[in-house]
Amino acid sequence: GSSFVREDKTVENGKRSKYPCNWELQGFGEYTYGRWYTIKGERPSDETGIYRYKFESPATTSGERIKIFFDGVMTDTEVFINGKPAGEMHQGGFYRFSYDITDLLKPGKKNLLEVKIAKESANKSINAAERKADWWLYGGIYRPVWLEVVPAVHMRHFILNADQHGKLQAAIEMEGDAKGYELSVSVRSLKDGKDIYTQENKSSISHQIKDSNKEQLVEGNWMNIQPWSTEDPICT
């Protein structure tokens, strides 16, 4: 577990806390129902807490990077490694975010992770979307946190858009100097794992990266697609 402390307490007085778990379930803070705004004079609870956890950094080879991923934190989140900020504050409780912490780590030594969380967002639009709702409001790290070792050049983010006729578009953002690298996209059957061929009778399509700072768009058309549907579900 990690240690946890409310902002109005000293870190030395922190208590052991399990995660992933919203902090109300462990006796910190209080629940407020999401329709608090319908009650005159009512305000939602807005605690701030700090998680502290010591860990050893994973081994890496030359050029590899270490990233820390948060699958879900409610709500505004600041991350510090050995007392230094990992990046800008993340706002929004329902989606994953990450930081490259390679240069902040002490290889072979204990490293300190501190996560400062404000239950209520400083962003009004986020509060309107996430906190004015028909559910209980909560705070804390409620989804898993993990480290990943990645190559110096890797995919940072991608979006796939496939239609029932076999057309596929892949929008890919790269991390690192990827100029001259080649991206390859292939499609396999869920039933037997075999390659599905394009209309040009190729098992994959390739894309040469000319500018790694730009989004890479890869497009292709595949034959004999059997799209999943409720009428014709494909079980794996």
Model-found features: residue ranges?
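Short, intrinsically disordered, charge-balanced linker/junction segments flanking boundaries
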Residues: 2-4, 198-199, 232-236
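Predominantly extracellular/luminal regions of secreted and cell-surface proteins
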Residues: 1-28
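Short, solvent-exposed loop/linker segments at the N-terminal edge
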Residues: 160-166
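Short, surface-exposed beta-strand/beta-hairpin micro-motifs centered on an aromatic residue
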Residues: 94-98, 215, 226-227
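Short glycine/proline/serine/threonine-rich loop/turn segments at secondary-structure transition edges
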Residues: 61-64, 105-110, 217-235
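Intrinsically disordered, low-complexity Pro/Gly/Ser/Thr-rich segments with frequent PxxP/GP/PP motifs
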Residues: 200-224
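Beta-strand-rich binding/interaction modules
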Residues: 81, 167-203, 207
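Accessory beta-strand-rich segments of carbohydrate-active enzymes
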Residues: 1, 22, 41-42, 46-157, ...
